[in-house]
A protein has these predicted regions:
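Bacterial N-terminal signal peptides that target proteins for export
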Residues: 1-11
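Short beta-strand and strand-turn-strand segments in soluble, beta-rich domains
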Residues: 119-136
Length: 372
C-alpha cells in the first residue's frame, strides 16, 4: 500500500502542475475540500434468474443462429447485433415450447430501439425505455410450438450497417428455448430456422448464459461527507466489481461477460447529510440511463442528460492512476466528466445496468454539499 501512495503522490504532483483540478460539469462550480476521492466499501450480492446474452458475432456477415439456449422461470434476454452485409436482413427472436403442456411467457419489462447506425443512440434509447419500465407483453405457446416474437413492426428489418439492440425480462412457467437469428429479408423465419446453422462466435466471445442476473451493491456504512470527503464506488472494473462467468450453450465453453452487460444493479446508499451523486465514465464514450428511488418517488435520469454521450473528453488513465484507483484512491481532475444524478439525504437507491455501446468501468461519485 505504501507503494501505491508513492505512485499516487507523483500522480497528484504531475496533475497539479497543470493548474487547478476541476471536473467538466456544473459540479466544477461547487466548493469541496479536496480533489482526492476515496473508494467507499460496499457489500455485493448476486441474485435472480438467468441472463441470455447475445453479442457475438457482433458484426453479422452471414445468415444463421446467433445464440440459443433453454431457460425456465425468471430470465432476461439481451441482444446486440449489427448487419455487416451489403443487403437488408431480418433479425428474429423465436421462442420454442420444449414441454408437453401449454406454456405462458409473461414479459414484465423491456427496451428496444429501432435499428440505427448511431450506436450510442441505439444504446441510450433501449436503456431509457427499459428503465421507464412500462412495457409488458404475453406469449402463449402450445406444446412444442415455435413462435416468432416481434413486438414492433419493422423494428427487426436491418439495412446494411444498422444495429439492433434490445433487452427484456420475462417469466416462463415451463422450459422454453430461445433463438436469436439473422436471416434473409424475404424468408420465412420458422422455415429458415429449421435449416439454419449456429454461427461461430467472434474473437470477443460476448455471448452466453449467466446465472443470477441481478447484483446488489450496498454501502457498508452511511456516507458522511464531513468525514469521508469525496467518495466513489466502482462498477465494471473486474477488480472491485467482478465480471460474471457463464456458459456458451452452443458449445459448452466457459465465457466471461466483459462489462457485465445485461446485469441489473441495485445501488443502495445511505447518507448522513445532503449529498450530490454523479456518474463518471472511466473507459471512454458512454450513453445510458438509470432509475432513482427516493422516499416514495422515482424517475429515470439519462447519463448524460444534456447530450447524447460523454466520456470522450476524459483522457486515458496511465498505469499509475489505474493502479491507484483499483487500490482505493482516485483523482477528480480537470478532465473528469460528471453526469448529475441528484442531491439526496438519507436513503436513496439507483437501478443501473451497463448500457449497450458504452464503455466501462464507471464511478458513482458522492460529493458533500453540507456538513450538518
Amino acid at each position: 500500500m505504501n507503494f501505491i501512495k508513492k505512485i499516487f503522490a507523483a500522480v497528484i504532483a504531475a496533475a497539479t502542475s497543470f493548474g487547478m483540478l476541476l471536473p467538466t460539469s456544473s459540479a466544477a462550480n461547487r466548493n469541496y475540500p479536496s480533489t482526492v476521492m476515496h473508494k467507499l466499501e460496499v457489500y455485493s450480492k448476486d441474485s435472480g434468474g438467468t441472463l441470455i446474452f447475445s453479442d457475438s458475432p457482433e458484426y453479422v456477415r452471414r445468415n444463421g443462429i446467433l445464440y440459443t439456449d433453454t431457460v425456465e422461470g425468471d430470465a432476461r434476454l439481451l441482444f446486440y447485433h449489427l448487419n455487416d452485409t451489403g443487403v437488408h436482413k431480418r433479425f428474429a427472436i423465436i421462442f420454442e415450447n420444449t414441454s408437453k403442456t401449454k406454456t405462458v411467457i409473461n414479459i414484465t419489462r423491456g427496451g428496444l430501439s429501432a435499428p440505427n447506425r448511431n450506436y450510442f443512440s441505439v444504446g441510450k434509447i433501449t436503456q431509457t425505455m427499459y428503465m421507464e419500465n412500462d412495457f409488458t407483453d404475453r406469449i402463449t405457446l402450445d406444446r412444442y410450438e415455435r413462435k416468432v416474437y416481434e413486438p414492433y413492426e419493422n423494428y427487426f428489418l436491418l439495412k446494411p450497417g444498422q444495429l439492433i439492440h434490445g433487452v427484456c425480462d420475462f417469466v416462463s412457467n415451463n422450459p422454453v428455448r430461445v433463438f436469436l437469428m439473422m436471416y434473409p429479408e424475404h424468408a420465412d423465419p420458422l422455415e429458415f430456422l429449421s435449416r439454419a446453422e449456429i454461427l461461430p462466435k467472434d474473437e470477443y466471445r460476448l455471448r452466453g448464459t449467466f446465472k443470477q442476473m441481478n447484483r446488489t451493491l450496498t454501502l457498508k456504512k452511511p456516507y458522511d461527507g464531513e468525514r469521508d470527503g469525496l467518495g466513489y464506488i466502482l462498477i465494471g472494473d473486474n477488480i472491485n466489481d467482478l465480471f460474471k462467468h457463464g456458459i456458451d450453450a452452443t458449445d459448452g465453453s466457459e465465457v466471461i461477460n466483459y462489462g457485465n452487460y445485461g446485469i441489473n444493479y441495485t445501488l443502495n446508499f445511505r447518507t448522513k447529510f445532503l449529498t450530490s451523486f454523479f456518474l463518471s465514465p472511466l473507459g471512454g464514450h458512454y450513453a445510458g440511463a438509470l432509475r432513482y428511488k427516493y422516499y416514495g418517488t422515482s424517475g429515470v435520469i439519462q447519463t448524460p442528460d444534456n447530450r447524447l454521450y460523454f466520456g470522450d473528453r476524459t483522457p486515458p488513465e496511465n498505469a499509475a492512476v489505474a493502479l491507484a484507483r483499483s487500490e482505493g484512491i482516485s483523482l477528480m481532475t480537470e478532465g473528469t466528466e460528471l453526469s448529475e444524478l441528484g442531491d439526496y439525504r438519507g436513503y436513496v437507491s439507483f437501478e443501473y445496468s451497463p448500457p449497450g455501446a458504452s464503455n466501462l468501468p464507471v464511478n458513482i461519485v458522492l460529493m458533500p454539499t453540507e456538513s450538518k
